[in-house]
Amino acid sequence: GTGEGWGAGAARGAGVWKSTNGGTSWTQLSATSSFYYVNDLVVRNESGSGVLYVATRGNYYGQSWHGSATQGLQRSTNGGVSFSQVLPNIPGESQNFAAADIEIGADNKLWVGTTTSSYGLTDRGGGRILTSTNGTTWTTAYTHSSGERVEVACAPSNTNYAYALIEASSQVDAIVKTTNNGSTWSSVSEPSDADGGISSTDFSRGQAWYDLI
């Protein structure tokens, strides 16, 4: 996936590229040419077939906003020939969620961490964790009211455990975990950085919107 979606100096990408020879050569999936900012992609086993999911967002580039029309979670069931956007709209807005991160749980459940959408919205859609068992119907498992970018990690050995790190105003605003597959969440203390020259929990150096990569 191409495009640097994290920052005002974002470089616009050219969609998703595919290799069938171990990375020796690549071809663009033509259906993704307008996926300007690809944040993540995964292939999920669905009834024996590989289904491709691509996390996309819009961003400001060259004096204008690009990618809003294709932001969200793009799903392909035919090897990338065509895609459909499967995330729901942000509540109260006509724009769907933008996806920052995609994870697949040990039970094959999909977890998506959102990020903020384009300016001009009352609710820009950040700070959410969305889950799905079929890839098309979604549940909001967690909302952090001031959150922006969300990164998720699922325990590979226990379907009940997942963790999320949530950015707000360039800082790590919260770390949360679930021990019951997303039904409830609790806070986790931020780790203390070994660098004594900064505040103990500033491991992202005030760039959590970027340094979570």
Task: Describe the function of each predicted region.
Residues 1-213:
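Extracellular glycan-interacting surfaces
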